[in-house]
Swiss-Prot record:
The gene is dxs. Its cofactor is Mg(2+); thiamine diphosphate. PANTHER family: 1-D-DEOXYXYLULOSE 5-PHOSPHATE SYNTHASE-RELATED, 1-DEOXY-D-XYLULOSE-5-PHOSPHATE SYNTHASE, CHLOROPLASTIC. GO terms for cellular component: cytosol. Its EC number is 2.2.1.7. Catalyzes the acyloin condensation reaction between C atoms 2 and 3 of pyruvate and glyceraldehyde 3-phosphate to yield 1-deoxy-D-xylulose-5-phosphate (DXP). Keywords: Isoprene biosynthesis, Magnesium, Metal-binding, Thiamine biosynthesis, Thiamine pyrophosphate, Transferase. It comes from Shewanella sediminis (strain HAW-EB3). Binds 1 Mg(2+) ion per subunit. Binds 1 thiamine pyrophosphate per subunit. This is 1-deoxy-D-xylulose-5-phosphate synthase. Disulfide bonds: none annotated.
């Protein structure tokens, strides 16, 4: 997307932070306006994360203006809000390629730019990384500064407080910017707090504060009284006592859309010693009315025309697997008030909006705290309740210890509805659901199911709901289901039993999951037998034995890492049965899968019908 200089006269002079820092401070408000306008048009053409970036425009300008990036380290938590950062760090003309195959990465990415000092995608990691860089900077003694930017949502994660507790103890110089976009800030409160922040971060206040500490070192009783008095006085006007208790000097809250106030406050804070936290108030979706009114709905958008003030109407399609899950959850909750739905801050994405509205007392949003969400489910199961933990595959990784220690070890009947299993597409390697079958297979007492369509998904969810001998997992992909007519009656499936979907000869394909349609298409060309295995664990032992004894080659197909996945389970079983035979494993390779459209990625990995057939024919040569 080339830049029309007539529409962006200041932005045209700020293609890099070095150029930005040459501009007079007086033009920064205009730069912010132009940057917001450019972001609006570029995301409209490319699709992508939208509302978060609109809310961090002034912050991004101020950070790169005050800090000498990339020498000074700037770390963005999660990265949804980093589009303005990408625009100002030499990637402006490539923004139209973001999240597309071969285009720039959806999140800050070390391989992409020296300004992206830490690759991100999951929340709550920035302060730990920043602390490490601050320790390294102190050892280096080159005057390097370190800044972490984290949103208020990520502050619900336990890792954040672990890092802050450690930072307060080590006391290295670092700044944490808390971007609080839960509410807009009124003009009066904004003016008051902007003034207080500049006063409290200024040289006069901090000199008195530090000098007083030195004077009182030998008088611990008076020192403690003075500390409590300071905290009390600050607590009367600012909500920072909690951060002070963790060892941080708290400044704020200030208006995160006042670029001049941000610059002045950061200039003051740049020279403060020890860990600092700057609390700013922003509005998600700032500058675009529909996104301001509905920041969740405009969090990520398809391609759209900003001038219409609405997203394009979605084309009629089959329901998504997330919607299938959400409807199933409502169906069982209508008949059983012991059913509880748990999500770690993914209500919309997991299809739980209707459930949360209809059954508010049975709905629990654990916030961005996957470990807590899993153990919350374990506790409910201990009391005879029926917890369903709806979680993305990539985020279940964060609750793996709890899955083992708190759920499986105690054989607790917790049902895991695992969304985004397999290729998720545009969000890239931090979000692909590549590993869940592999890491769950190793856990004793687990029952793992992979549906081939939405009806199997409903039946498997019901199977997990009925199963009381231990934890169960139903793993399904992102996106639309296959369009199978819904079977209303739900019946529990026999545990560990698959189905023959096509009878052939010589080659038997064991399918795990929603690639079944492609597998059946490939099988037609070579007259292969196709089995819908349904259960990854326990495997259908009798079916595997039968197929192995009547065919020359077994082929396993899964949208999961080959290493340790369902195919590995088949190989292990054959070894136990002392029934060795050729097995071709088809799945995700031993690499992190890059971003792009899901269909493009599956084709590139040869996991579409043509690719599956090609791999089998190559093996048979």
């Amino acid at each position: 997307m080339s830049l029309d200089i007539s529409n962006y006269p200041v932005l045209a002079q700020a293609n890099t932070p070095d150029e930005l820092r040459q501009l007079p401070q007086a033009v920064l408000p205009q730069l912010a306006d132009e940057l917001r306008g450019f972001l609006l048009k570029s995301v409209g053409k490319s699709s992508g994360h939208f509302a978060s970036g609109l809310g961090t425009v002034e912050l991004t300008v101020a950070l790169h203006y005050v800090y000498n990036t990339p020498f000074d380290r700037l770390i963005w938590d999660v990265g949804h809000q980093a589009y303005p950062h990408k625009i100002l760090t030499g990637r402006r003309d490539k923004m139209h390629t973001i999240r597309q195959k071969g285009g720039i990465h959806p999140f800050p990415w070390r391989e992409e730019s020296e300004y992206d000092t830490f690759s991100v995608g999951h929340s709550g990691t920035s302060i730990s990384a920043a602390l490490a860089m601050a320790v390294a900077a102190e050892k280096e003694q080159a005057g390097r500064k370190v800044v972490s930017v984290i949103g208020d949502g990520a502050m619900t994660g336990g890792m954040v407080f672990e890092a802050m507790n450690h930072a307060g103890d080590l006391h290295n110089d670092m700044l944490v910017v808390l971007n609080d976009n839960e509410m807009s800030i009124s003009e009066n409160v904004g003016a008051l707090n902007n003034h207080l922040a500049q006063l409290m971060s200024g040289r006069f206040y901090t000199t008195i504060r530090e000098s007083s500490k030195k004077v009182l070192e030998g008088m611990p009783v008076i020192k403690e009284m003075a500390k409590r008095t300071e905290e009390h006085l600050k607590g009367m006007v600012v909500p920072g006592t909690m951060f002070e208790e963790l060892g941080f000097n708290y400044i704020g809250p200030i208006d995160g859309h006042d670029v001049d106030a941000l610059v002045e406050t950061m200039r003051n804070m740049r020279n403060l010693s020890g860990p600092q936290i700057l609390h700013i108030m922003t509005k998600k979706g700032r500058g675009y009315e529909p996104a301001e009114k509905d920041p969740i709905g405009w969090h990520a958008v398809p391609k759209f025309d900003p001038s219409t003030f609405e997203k394009p109407a979605s084309k009629p399609s089959n329901p998504t697997f997330s919607q299938v899950f959400g409807k199933w959850l409502c169906d069982v909750a209508e008949k059983d008030d012991k059913v509880l739905g748990i999500t770690p801050a993914m209500r919309e994405g997991s299809g739980m909006v209707e459930f949360s509205q209809r059954f508010p007392k049975q709905y629990f949003d654990a916030a961005i705290a996957e470990q807590h969400a899993v153990t919350l489910g374990a506790g409910f199961a201990c009391e005879g309740l029926k917890p369903v933990v709806a979680i993305y595959s990539t985020f279940l990784q964060r609750g793996y210890d709890q899955l083992i220690h708190d759920v499986a070890l105690q054989k607790l009947p917790v049902l895991f509805a695992i969304d985004r299993g397999g290729i998720v597409g545009a969000d890239g390697p931090t979000h692909q659901g590549a590993f869940d079958l592999s890491f769950m297979r190793t856990v004793p007492n687990m029952v793992i199911m992979a549906p081939s369509d939405e009806n199997e998904c409903r039946q498997m969810l019901y199977t997990g709901y009925c199963y009381r001998e231990g934890p169960t997992a139903v793993r399904y992909p992102r996106g639309s289901a296959t369009g199978e007519p819904q079977v209303e009656e739900m019946q529990a499936l026999p545990i560990g039993k698959g189905l023959i979907k096509r009878q052939g000869q010589k080659v038997a394909i064991l399918n795990f999951g929603t690639l079944l349609a492609d597998v059946l298409t490939a099988a037609e060309s070579i007259d292969a037998t196709v089995a819908d295995m349904r259960f990854v664990k326990p495997l259908d032992v009798e079916l595997v034995k039968e197929l192995a004894s009547s065919h020359d080659l077994l082929v396993t197909v899964e949208e999961n890492a080959i290493m340790g996945g369902a195919g590995s389970g088949v190989l292990e079983l054959l070894q136990q049965l002392k029934q060795p035979m050729p097995v071709l494993q088809i799945g995700l390779p031993d690499e992190f899968i890059k971003h792009g459209a899901s269909g493009e990625i599956l084709a590139e990995l040869r996991l579409d019908a043509a690719g599956i057939l090609e791999q089998i024919e190559e093996y048979l040569k």
